[in-house]
Amino acid sequence: MEQCYNRGCGQLFDPQTNNDESCRHHPGEPFFHDAYKGWSCCNKKSVDFTEFLNIKGCTLAKHSNVKPPEPEKPVKDESDKDEVIEVRAPIREALPRPPIDSPLTVIQPTVAPALKDMVFAVKTPAAQKSSDAIEVGTTCKNNGCTYSFTGNSSDFGECTYHPGVPIFHEGMKFWSCCQKRTSDFSQFMAQKGCTYGEHKWVKENDDKKVVQCRYDWHQTATNVVMAIYAKKYDYSQSVIELNPIRLHVNLVFPEQDNARFDLDLELRGIVNVSNASAHMYGTKVEIKLPKLEPGSWSNLNFPNKKLPVVKKSQVEEKKKQEESDEEFFDLDDIKAETSFRLSEMSMQSPNNLD
């Protein structure tokens, strides 16, 4: 008796009685996939190994005492064993750089309460100190205000005035800051101001002093954060302007005769202006510049570059364009028929005017 080596048979057979229908076996290969066990020659499969071994063969043939050849194992190629595969990140195409003279957008900062208290404490003594040099009867320099200096505490009260300029056009007289128009000069002069603020007893000096402030910056994956270290600056007069590649900061220091710190930078990268923000604290100004494209900045700005003159914001440009055809006048240069200056015109009780 000889052993049959056909897959799925495993019986002993007599070579003398061996014929074409003696052996029921599986001519295919066994396979194991996803917990299933089966044969490649038929569709029978099972998850149980015992059931898999008991699956009857699907083909009849003679018994064979020859072992079937083992399936060839794939030859392991070790020729690339020491090869180093370098994976590089895909190169992103850089965004086009906007023009440096693109319109600047004014960033409205969040002001800390401590800074507001500090500025108020600085401005109040300065106003009281300047009152010693103001003569009684001096008219407020704000347009539209007829209040005269009396030397009392009420001189530092609320002022109602026009921040704009007078315009005379096609027989109409009005202020650039509001929409009220009239053809009568007396009504124009008596028109109540549209803005509330403080009285101005002395004209501002155009010769501004310069202050040097230290600034620094750091960056994250999505933002560049800049800090300007300054104290006792007036948040209401200071300006932060930005376009995609340019930052302009102007800080005013009332305690130093309105000296200014002016910083104008061409930024190294491109920023998202709409998401930019600023915070004003008692010891610094912090500006957050969101990156418009991923990547690290090698520096904050391009040093030693001469930048074009700062443009006004789009709103100011539009307003300027609308008023470009109008005629502007300085009220101090206009004389009435009675030969007295309009800025000095007052009634018997000027402080009682509405």
From Swiss-Prot:
Disruption phenotype: Results in centrosome amplification and lethality. Cells become polyploid or undergo apoptosis. Homozygotes died as third instar larvae. RNAi-mediated knockdown in neuronal cells, results in severe mitotic defects in the larval brain and is lethal at the third-instar stage. RNAi-mediated knockdown in the female germline, results in embryos failing to hatch due to various mitotic defects such as abnormal chromosome condensation and adherent spindle formation. However, in contrast to RNAi-mediated knockdown in the brain, embryos do not exhibit centrosome amplification. GO terms for biological process: centrosome duplication; positive regulation of microtubule polymerization; regulation of cell size; regulation of dendrite development; regulation of mitotic spindle assembly. Residues 4-63, 140-199 form the CHORD domain. Zn(2+) 3 binds at residues 140, 145, 159, 199. It comes from the Eukaryota. One of its GO terms (molecular function) is zinc ion binding. Residues 210-301 form the CS domain. It is found in: Cytoplasm; Nucleus; Cytoplasm, Cytoskeleton, Spindle. Keywords: Cytoplasm, Cytoskeleton, Metal-binding, Nucleus, Phosphoprotein, Repeat, Zinc. InterPro entries: CHORD_dom (IPR007051), CHRD1 (IPR039790), CS_dom (IPR007052), HSP20-like_chaperone (IPR008978). Zn(2+) 2 binds at residues 26, 41-42, 58. GO terms for cellular component: cytoplasm; mitotic spindle microtubule; nucleus; perinuclear region of cytoplasm. PROSITE patterns: CHORD, CS. Pfam families: CHORD, CS. Disulfide bonds: none annotated. The modification Phosphoserine is found at residues 324, 339. Interacts with Hsp83. Regulates centrosome duplication and mitotic spindle dynamics. Also involved in controlling the size of dendritic arbors. May act as co-chaperone for Hsp83. During mitotic spindle assembly, regulates microtubule (MT) dynamics by binding to MTs and promoting MT polymerisation. Promotes the elongation and retraction of terminal branches in response to changes in body size, possibly acting downstream of the TORC2 pathway to enable proportional scaling of dendritic arbors. This is Cysteine and histidine-rich domain-containing protein morgana. It comes from Drosophila melanogaster (Fruit fly). The lineage of its organism: Eukaryota, Metazoa, Ecdysozoa, Arthropoda, Hexapoda.
